[in-house]
Amino acid sequence: MDNLRETFLSLEDGLGSSDSPGLLSSWDWKDRAGPFELNQASPSQSLSPAPSLESYSSSPCPAVAGLPCEHGGASSGGSEGCSVGGASGLVEVDYNMLAFQPTHLQGGGGPKAQKGTKVRMSVQRRRKASEREKLRMRTLADALHTLRNYLPPVYSQRGQPLTKIQTLKYTIKYIGELTDLLNRGREPRAQSA
């Protein structure tokens, strides 16, 4: 914990230099008084700036997190672009890389792009399914309209169109009556022969 505190204290000293005005103007955590103010007297308070560096990486070196570190320092410890300073093990970090907007962290090839593709695909599937359903309902409506035209006027309701259910019920009833008529017509012929 003491090493972490020393790391943040040295980072704060490094921010006072003139080479990081973009960082201070965009984050403005050093001049702000509040719960995130760095205070050596109170170790229980947070030692990180308001937008925490931990939100970008759990490693103090941005190269380990896959972020560019372009300060041109000597490379050591397997992390390219970062140099370890002295025996204290502190890592030198280029703070200009923090001046970009956090939206750049959501790279184009990340999971968000795949999720967006899935969303677009499901939208396309829904549209196609909706078009198929519309076509099916249109075909069904045309068939019911044709069926209504074949029903005798006895089954219609004085100028009001029949509902789908009424059309089907009356059609079944009408087919039953026609079947009875045909069966009655065949019986006398069978008896006479």
Swiss-Prot record:
Disordered: annotated span: 34-59
UniProt signal peptide: none
One Pfam family of this chain: HLH
Entry's Gene Ontology molecular function annotations: chromatin binding; DNA-binding transcription activator activity, RNA polymerase II-specific; DNA-binding transcription factor activity, RNA polymerase II-specific; protein dimerization activity; RNA polymerase II cis-regulatory region sequence-specific DNA binding; sequence-specific double-stranded DNA binding
Residue ranges with Low complexity bias: 40-59
bHLH domain residues: 124-178
Transmembrane segments: none
Keywords of the record: Developmental protein, Differentiation, DNA-binding, Nucleus, Transcription, Transcription regulation
Protein name: Mesogenin-1
Source organism phylogeny: Eukaryota, Metazoa, Chordata, Craniata, Vertebrata
